[in-house]
């Protein structure tokens, strides 16, 4: 084959012109002349391969030249034929025939391929190549075989441990540890592919003008890292910041993000310490202009960082540390990972749908952990499909696997194979596969099964993640039916270890009481925990969420004893009032036999019933006949300042157990006549007494009943309602 025939084969497939050294090879290994590529890019505003339609992400100038074409052209121009016997041989490769000719004729050295050595060496200086450190025979069919000392032309880098190269016209894969890289491959541009839609056109443009909007499968050029969860990138002619969890970076972009992570974090912390409370005045304009983190208008603008950090703090909270109460409402826009969809649907939500991240702590009798309630909008209910928590520690067995630590949060991206999942760690940010039996869904309904009390000596309370349509204003008012919110209320429970609370029963209590029923009729969508073990105080968790502006003060307890009366074993005073606070909710305060208080806040009513079986069967001592015990029921003053009449309740001897009463709402201002329970003969030993406290909401829509069976015989008397604003009925047993 002569030189003219060779030049006829070297033509561009598009324009059929002769190829020269300026021809560029695309990532799909197709070669075209530079003018054709420029015309394609100018016409379509993007560069795709004319044959296979593969999209090219880099510029035309950054494309490499075809090394084989360059060598062929150099050989033709120098007058040396590189084709011998119908087979192509690389320059600088000494064959056995050339070696014999070199020994027989010294002049043949001038015509041997080694005369091309200086020319080829000058060209090879810019070619990515590596030198073999050992013999490698390969284990798979696609592996490259070479000997120690061979020079391998590098084609591309698969990952940190594998290369694809060529030697003697044969291409294959080989490990990076078996070669020494002489000339590194040109690094591909740091690019990332969008996994989800990120569009903020419906939000406030003034706050989100620095965000880079994109759609799924868009390719973004990474410029730098802003902070732990945000990066700066370029898409077309637009430059802005975007959440890192929304994209999948390539190897170059991953190295760039990891390299600048520590520097950007330290820089952000330094700027946050130097920033003054008045952010309107830029004291250090040059520093803020250089920092990409200064583009964020405020700490509450992007809630994705806040949501992730809140989840990590709840997952990794130490057992001896109580959760901090978060009271500031956080705007959860579409930048939150909870807005992510599995199939790339557009995440369009109302601009005004805001959620309040708050924690509610009921006050137990003894110090310890309390129930935390975190509320987010109901539009993010699909967050339950991909949020998991590691149950056990797992060490990765391969490079594609993900290390897990107990309690670590993971966002699952999909199933890899049977028994394996693929996800990204919310702590390290790494992506990999892991066994499915090592994790549990955070927002799964099956987590409710774990919210039980395994032992009365080691009780636990449940952390409630409530997805509710209700809203609590900063003044603590409870509203419902907001048109901006929709979806049912649901709660999921995550067990949290707590310290055992003290027993609320006094020393005179014989036996343990079991709380049978705890119900809370708060509006329409209340959620309630039901204890399943005995001897455990009830922690009431409902749909009512109290903001820090709501203050619930326990009523003061006073001891009252009538004149000319022997001291009663348990003389107490109970005040039941619906104090007019900003929430419009009644506060029920009662005192136990041991003098310890329990305060509950209810939306409308609370019903508690308890039964206790006495150990001893002997009858209780009768109270003195001269002075029966009495209890003063003092109603609270209403809003208009009108004082209500103080009622005194006296006990009747040996009255039967009173039946349950329901306090109906007042319909008029007339006082009802008290219904006196007639006394009867004492029943057998099995008869039990009960103490009933009835109270009603101010509006009179609901009523509550609290029953505590502590003694065997009961003395009761009903008290009429004192006003239209409050209905109180107190029934107490004597000792």
UniProtKB/Swiss-Prot annotation:
Highest rank taxon of the organism: Eukaryota
Single GO cellular component term: nucleoplasm
InterPro entries: Endophilin_SH3RF, SH3-like_dom_sf, SH3_domain, SH3RF2_RING-HC_Zfn, SH3RF2_SH3_1, SH3RF2_SH3_2, SH3RF2_SH3_3, Znf_RING
Alphabetized Pfam families for the sequence: SH3_1 (PF00018), SH3_2 (PF07653), zf-RING_2 (PF13639)
Oligomeric form and interacting partners: Interacts with FASLG and PPP1CA. Interacts with PAK4 and TNFRSF1A. Interacts with DLK1, MAP3K10, MAPK8IP1/JIP1, MAPK8IP2/JIP2 and MAPK8IP3/JIP3. Interacts with RAC1 (both active GTP- or inactive GDP-bound forms).
Family: Belongs to the SH3RF family.
UniProt protein name: E3 ubiquitin-protein ligase SH3RF2
